[in-house]
């Protein structure tokens, strides 16, 4: 784990492939620095939860990695390739290896769910209309939406259905890497828990690497393999939940050991104890 007292980068095990590698990243809006020499690794096959206080730049980092926000300086490698050194054609190929679920879904309101899912397919320019229809229906089924949702417009969907439709679009080209920006935001507790379960199932079934920006403690506890925390423009700690709970940084202590964090941690420990007793 990394923290302020020990600023070195967490060393990956020999068998862990680094899918996203960020080094000494600086991002600024005007004279305001948002990222100040940020370092981060995301490993193949893991679910990484990325947390931080409001306005700290969690979504900005995700959008910078995606190339939607310009960086001032620093290195961003995706699948072992320096993003800055890719040609336009190489960049398009790399971009097809990931999918994105933006905050609030970001579906095109004038398109049906089917058409939204097909958008990434159309951009490739070599998938037939018939195959796009078949694939769109498969993606709908994959995220747990009924076939009847295909021809609905976003305004006709519930919040949970919008999230699932947006996830289906993110999975349209069978990506290796999925970016999720606050996927459970706006969902009720039951809907959020169901969406967490869906993400975990898809990650396991499809072998996805997941980069998830979130503030949802339930998601962090239930589906994340590792957590990285952002404060003061840097990753102040990165590691599994046990290490995050032991970190002495003031923000992390307030986040994980506050009233809600302590209550959730206690409930999960109680559940684990009951499960262990049930196996005896």
PLM-predicted stretches and their roles:
Residues 82, 130-148:
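Conserved ABC ATPase "signature" region
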Residues 178-181:
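Catalytic Walker B motif of ABC-type/P-loop ATPase nucleotide-binding domains
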Residues 172-176:
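A short, proline-enriched helix->beta-strand linker immediately N-terminal to the Walker B motif
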Residues 66:
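Helix-to-loop junction immediately C-terminal to a conserved catalytic motif
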Residues 153-157, 161:
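Conserved ABC ATPase signature
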């Amino acid at each position: 784990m990394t923290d302020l007292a020990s600023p070195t980068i967490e060393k990956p095990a020999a068998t862990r492939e680094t899918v996203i590698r960020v080094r000494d990243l600086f991002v600024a809006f005007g004279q305001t620095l948002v990222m100040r020499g940020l370092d981060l690794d995301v490993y193949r096959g893991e679910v990484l939860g990325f947390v931080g206080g409001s306005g700290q730049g969690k979504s900005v980092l995700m959008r910078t990695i995606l190339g939607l926000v310009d960086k001032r300086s620093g290195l961003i490698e995706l699948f072992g390739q320096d993003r800055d050194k890719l040609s336009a054609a190489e960049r398009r190929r790399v971009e097809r290896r990931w999918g994105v679920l933006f905050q609030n879904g970001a579906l095109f309101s004038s398109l049906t769910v089917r058409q939204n899912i097909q958008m990434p397919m159309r951009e490739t320019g070599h998938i037939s209309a018939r195959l796009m229809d078949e694939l769109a229906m498969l993606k709908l089924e994959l995220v747990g939406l009924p076939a009847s949702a295909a021809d609905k417009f976003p305004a006709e969907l519930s919040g949970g259905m919008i999230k699932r439709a947006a996830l289906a679009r993110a999975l349209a080209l069978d990506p290796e890497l999925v970016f999720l920006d606050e996927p459970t935001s706006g969902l009720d507790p039951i809907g959020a828990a169901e969406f967490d379960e869906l993400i975990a199932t898809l990650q396991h079934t499809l072998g996805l690497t997941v980069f998830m920006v979130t503030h949802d403690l339930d998601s962090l506890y239930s589906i994340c393999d590792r957590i990285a925390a952002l404060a003061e423009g840097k990753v102040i700690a990165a590691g599994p939940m046990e290490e995050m709970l032991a970190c002495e940084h003031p923000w992390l202590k307030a986040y994980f050991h506050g009233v809600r964090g302590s209550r959730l941690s206690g409930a999960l420990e109680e559940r684990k104890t009951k499960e262990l007793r049930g196996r005896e």
